[in-house]
């Protein structure tokens, strides 16, 4: 196995190949792959389906990376040096064990797609500059532990896809209404009871748009609209009646629905998703 990894490194260097695929090789430490960090010319590195628990600071030496895929490992932390990958456009960290992101993570000036699905992240995991990632077009935060989506989400004005499925969200900030380029919003499987009226600023009811919101404990008026269809929900939350009811609801500060501690739904998806990317 190690010989074939060595050969991959040598071939990439000799033939100046920009893409290196080391997925599903049983790698537990990137430093064990001799010569990997000398491949400063590569633009794509795939290390999905391995046994990595950390990413070494040397990652910064791969300064031309545009695509970096760590999907389905056991990574618990990232080095601050990851933010020096100034050309990185696509970062997949889905299905790992991250409960925090490093300081300065938000200074990736070219990042367009960030996949953090199935980790242990919450609103407290995000560094102060996370929402400086203003080039993001797709942000996947499903299957984490978010109870609150920070209002700074509104700064990510280029977002077209936002996936928040299966978290513990008890509310959405009004700033979500500033994401006017959004084409897909996934909020199913949370603890949401109401929607901010500002969500009505978005067009998520067309044939090319996706709005998924099932498995939430909606208040009765919203649940009734969902029975009629998504376009009815959006029509309703734009109404003056709803804005008034929403204001009353928020003033009353009701107790949020109980947390769903049954994470078996999350765990059961893991083996199914393991080979899908």
Curated annotation (Swiss-Prot):
Q: Report keywords, A-Z.
A: Acetylation, Leucine-rich repeat, Repeat
| An example Gene Ontology biological process | positive regulation of GTPase activity
Task: Please list the residue ranges that the record marks as compositionally biased, kind Basic and acidic residues.
Answer: 7-24, 256-265
Which residues are recorded as modified (N-acetylserine)? 2
Spans of the LRR repeats are: 41-63, 64-85, 87-109, 110-133, 135-156, 158-179, 181-202
Source domain of life is Eukaryota
An example Gene Ontology cellular component term from the record?
A: cytosol
Task: Tell me the InterPro entries matching this sequence.
Answer: Leu-rich_rpt, Leu-rich_rpt_typical-subtyp, LRR_dom_sf, LRR_domain-containing, LRR_R13L4/SHOC2-like
Q: Where is this region: Disordered?
A: 1-24, 250-277
Which PANTHER family does the record cross-reference, listed alphabetically?
A: PTHR48051, RAS SUPPRESSOR PROTEIN 1
Q: What does this protein do?
A: Potentially plays a role in the Ras signal transduction pathway. Capable of suppressing v-Ras transformation in vitro.
Q: State what protein this is by name.
A: Ras suppressor protein 1
Organism of derivation: Homo sapiens
Write the gene name: RSU1
């Amino acid at each position: 196995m190690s010989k074939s990894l060595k050969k991959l490194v040598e071939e990439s260097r000799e033939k100046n190949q920009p893409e290196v695929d080391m997925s599903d090789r049983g790698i537990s430490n990137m430093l064990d792959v001799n010569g990997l960090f000398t491949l400063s010319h590569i633009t794509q590195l795939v290390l999905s389906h391995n046994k990595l628990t950390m990413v070494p600071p040397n990652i910064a030496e791969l300064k031309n990376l545009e695509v970096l895929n760590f999907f389905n490992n056991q990574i618990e932390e990232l080095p601050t040096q990851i933010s020096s990958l100034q050309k990185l456009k696509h970062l997949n960290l889905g299905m790992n064990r991250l409960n925090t992101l490093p300081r300065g993570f938000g200074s990736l000036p070219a990042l367009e797609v960030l996949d953090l699905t199935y980790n242990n992240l919450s609103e407290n995991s995000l560094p102060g500059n996370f929402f400086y990632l203003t080039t993001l077009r797709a942000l996947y935060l499903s299957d984490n532990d978010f109870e609150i989506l920070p209002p700074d989400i509104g700064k990510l004005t280029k977002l077209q896809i936002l996936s928040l499925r299966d978290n513990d969200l008890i509310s959405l900030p009004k700033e979500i209404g500033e994401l006017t380029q959004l084409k897909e919003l996934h909020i199913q499987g949370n603890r949401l009871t109401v929607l901010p009226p500002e969500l009505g600023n978005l067009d998520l009811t067309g044939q090319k748009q996706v709005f998924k919101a099932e498995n939430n404990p909606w208040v009765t008026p919203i649940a009734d609209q969902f029975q009629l269809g998504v376009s009815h929900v959006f029509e309703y939350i734009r109404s003056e009646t709803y804005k008034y009811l929403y204001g009353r609801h928020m003033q009353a500060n009701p107790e949020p629905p109980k947390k769903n501690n049954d994470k078996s739904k999350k765990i059961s998806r893991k083996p199914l998703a393991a080979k899908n990317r």
